[in-house]
């Protein structure tokens, strides 16, 4: 189990297995605890200074948790989109409710749209209420401009060309096989802020 959510940990603990990796549920305290080899992942998540010192992508960290070596493998998406590329550029502006501070301000998105003008076709984020529609929309974009969000990870799995906008999260943790990362020009002491 590679998820720290207590309910997911409790569910995975109920599965009969001879070897476990990742996290387990502590019923006495109601929190996630680490199995052997996973303690450093909790430290990355809980301690900002440790997080800054860790210079690995999450893929590499997760592979290590299960005793394997990451060799640049990308994500596998269990969904096969049916859409064709329709738009030159997709603007993935919404980050969801969990981390609103990851969002690039809307006025910047509008300014970027004006700068691009009519040179390329632009599509604004679609499928906000339906994950299948969201996959299809991402697949319909040739280049994907996105905040650090679920859409970024889906676009990576779909092998899209990506321009990723980072703010409060640590860009070095995210593996983007085909794209670039844009970071704040100033090095803020708080980054990573999440």
Model-predicted regions and their roles:
Residues 1-194:
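Catalytic machinery of carbohydrate-active enzymes
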């Amino acid at each position: 189990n590679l998820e720290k959510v207590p309910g997911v940990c409790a569910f995975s603990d109920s599965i009969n297995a001879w070897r476990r990796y990742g996290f387990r549920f502590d019923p006495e305290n109601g929190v996630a605890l680490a199995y052997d080899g996973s303690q450093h992942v909790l430290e990355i998540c809980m301690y900002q200074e440790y997080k800054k010192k860790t210079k690995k992508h999450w893929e590499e960290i997760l592979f290590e948790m299960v005793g394997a070596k990451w060799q640049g493998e990308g994500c596998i998406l269990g969904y096969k989109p049916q859409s064709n590329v329709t738009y030159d550029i997709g603007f993935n502006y919404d980050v969801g409710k969990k981390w609103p501070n990851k969002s690039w301000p809307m006025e910047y998105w509008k300014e970027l749209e004006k700068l691009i003008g009519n040179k390329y076709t632009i599509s604004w984020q679609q499928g906000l209420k339906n994950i299948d529609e969201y996959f299809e929309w991402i697949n319909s974009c040739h280049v994907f401009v996105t905040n650090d969000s679920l859409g970024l990870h889906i676009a990576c799995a779909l092998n899209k060309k990506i321009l990723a906008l980072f703010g409060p999260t640590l860009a070095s943790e995210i593996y983007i096989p085909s794209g670039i990362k844009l970071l704040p020009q100033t090095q803020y002491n708080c980054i990573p802020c999440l």
